[in-house]
Amino acid sequence: MSYYFKNLKPGYESDEELEDDEILKTLSKRYADEDESASDDELSSLSFDALRRAERQLEEESRKEKAGSQNESKPALKNAKRSKEKELELADSFKAKSYTEESFGENSDSSSENEGLFEEEEVVRGNKNSKADHGKNRKKSHAPSEQSSKKKVSRIRKIPGLETPKSMNENLYQDIRFDKSLGKAEDYESIRKRYQFLDEYRQKEISELSRLLSDRKFVNKISERERDEMQEKLTSMRSKLQTLKNRDLDRKILKDYETEINKGNKTKYHLKESEKRKVIQKYKFDHMKAKQREKVMDRKRKKRLGKEFKQFSFHNR
């Protein structure tokens, strides 16, 4: 068989369809040639005046478009600049701290202690913005100013009722049972009644100390410093016990005097502080011995003379 018959393949299209395609191609070529010739004829028929007018109109329209675009672009540029500035300010506020890394090469100074570490550099803009924000947050001039909690208090106020008396040292240990700020506000009388049994123990301690100090063998064994400390302790214990007894006596005197005054009265009468002092002095003076009265009178006379002596004119120079 020849080569021609080997390469033959069956076709699905009929001969009529192929003929129709060829006709359509020829018609489309014809119409395209006619359109080109018509456009050439139209351009050739136009005059030079019409072409000039058309060019002028096109130039005017292009100028107007340029002017309008420039006017519109100015506010757009301003808005763009403002938006960029705002973005930069926000970025600076968010950047609280920036870090710079030191060089690790051979040229770096070996004497620097911070070699290989990051140095913190506070941004100036961030500090300015924070100060401005702090100023804006303060509403009025009479508003309270903000202060750090680490700052010490300038003045410690004394609360009435919680002050330590002059006789007590503030640095000494204070019993919480008698502290007004921690316990109930109770009278001295109730506390004294509750702990009056301690007087017996105090008296025993005083007698024991006095017995040891009177013993010569014991005194020779200890040093002079220890002996002086024991003597001071003995005197302080005796004075404390005596003050407690004097307070009990004063309270008893006033109680008896008020009961005598308010026997037949429905409304109770309470003495003033000055009257209480006078009643106590009168009772003690009446119940003193003759020698004790003389000593008290001499002490008062010296006190009065000292006051009068200070009032003389030569002391005021």
Swiss-Prot record:
It is found in: Nucleus, Nucleolus. This is rRNA biogenesis protein RRP36. One of its GO terms (cellular component) is nucleolus. Associates with 90S and pre-40S pre-ribosomal particles. Residues 1-20, 54-168 are annotated as: Disordered. Residues 220-248 form a coiled coil. The keyword tRNA processing does not apply. Residues 54-67, 82-100 have a biased composition (Basic and acidic residues). Belongs to the RRP36 family. It comes from the Eukaryota. GO terms for biological process: maturation of SSU-rRNA from tricistronic rRNA transcript (SSU-rRNA, 5.8S rRNA, LSU-rRNA). Component of the 90S pre-ribosome involved in the maturation of rRNAs. Required for early cleavages of the pre-RNAs in the 40S ribosomal subunit maturation pathway. It comes from Lachancea thermotolerans (strain ATCC 56472 / CBS 6340 / NRRL Y-8284) (Yeast). Its main location: nucleus. Residues 101-115 have a biased composition (Low complexity).
